[in-house]
Amino acid sequence: AGSGAANEQAITLAQVDNIRQITINKYGWDPLGVASTTESNQENTSLRVDYILNENHRLTYNYKSTEGDRLRASGSNSSFYFESASYFKGEKTDTSSILLVSDWSDNLVSEIYYSNKSTDTSQESPAGQNVPNFYIDDAYGMRVYLGADIYRSANELATETDFLKAKLTYYTGNHKITAGYENTTWDIYNLFVVAQDGEWEFDSLADHEARVASSFST
């Protein structure tokens, strides 16, 4: 499949603009223009702090954040997708941890470790999530898609993981005795609704302009 750009297909930029203006004037929302397949953003942040409380106790803190998104666009020789029919696939991950190591004596050491990781994944139309999905079966000889993809109109996943570990180590002669505790908890939120704001099909551009849909579903 191609990128869906107007200069790679039979449809012209003027025709794309005409469909766009019809949609704005008749339906009150902007399907945007020609989609780009190269738009992406990435941002990373990290922090580490080592702190010596005293000669027997040491604390280490780590934090890392990664956030990015990429525009996913479609297209073919017989189909044209407006930018609103593409989607941003975004993901943000925050991870933090803290470790406390304590030397209680020459023979006894304790470690307490806690970490939290949260990940939010989204798939959103550049036009926003409150726009319908339109497709026109024949507009200038092509099938044209506008608005939020029916599988991206409400698509979100959020996960959070908490991990706690406590460990006690005792050295006696040639032996090492350990005792510990570990616990992991998960919290998951998943939202998925097909065609949240409706799906309209139009047989032709004239029907689209006349607001005459051949089918409608929600």
Q: Where are these predicted regions, by residue range?
A:
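Surface-exposed beta-strand-turn/loop segments characteristic
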Residues: 1-41
